[in-house]
Amino acid sequence: NTFVASANCGLYCGAKVDFVDIDINTFNISLEKLKKKLHVASKNNSLPKIIVPVDFAGNPYDHEDLKKLSIKYKFRILEDASHAFGTKIGKKLLSPNLGSEIVVFSFHPVKPFTTAEGGVALTNNKKVYEKLKMFRNHGIIKDKNNLKNKNYSSWYFEQKDLGFNYRMNDLQAALGISQLKKLNNFNIKRNKNAKYYLSNLKSKSLTFQFVNKKNFS
């Protein structure tokens, strides 16, 4: 379970993209199948630099085990947490503190939290943070410490790299602030609705996603 955007981010960089099948219980990435791929890749000297796991339907994958694999095989984790804004693993909110280099949340209207469109990337890496700020604004910088031309006026800027226009407007920000106040109630209501569906569909020949009761999403 993934989305084209997760693969596209690698293709934008000229990377080779490969896929790992899901665990039939959690619907998240199968770490057993990933281990097998990593073992083969290690022998072939073709280990991945990045793994992009998904917290499908807000249900977090096994962060602890994937972090151990990342240390063993020296890859970074770029987490697609599009569905998981407000998710807790145990008592900890989903964040880069749990092992990912970057955690990306979507603010699309069908997600738990919305600003009509857009999203946010969280990181504890200062260099990544500065690059993200640059890429969201056409690759432009105004920080005097990083400018080549030190004789500049207040209007002066330099383009360091190719970038995009990912700036959030004021209307979206205002909507997001209002949504933040309701986020916990939104997630509680979704859990209540999920329990209703599960209890009324038990007799059907359906397979449901396993959710660790210690987690909340």
Locate the predicted segments by residue.
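PLP-dependent aminotransferase class I/II
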Residues: 32-36, 44, 50-54, 59-65, ...
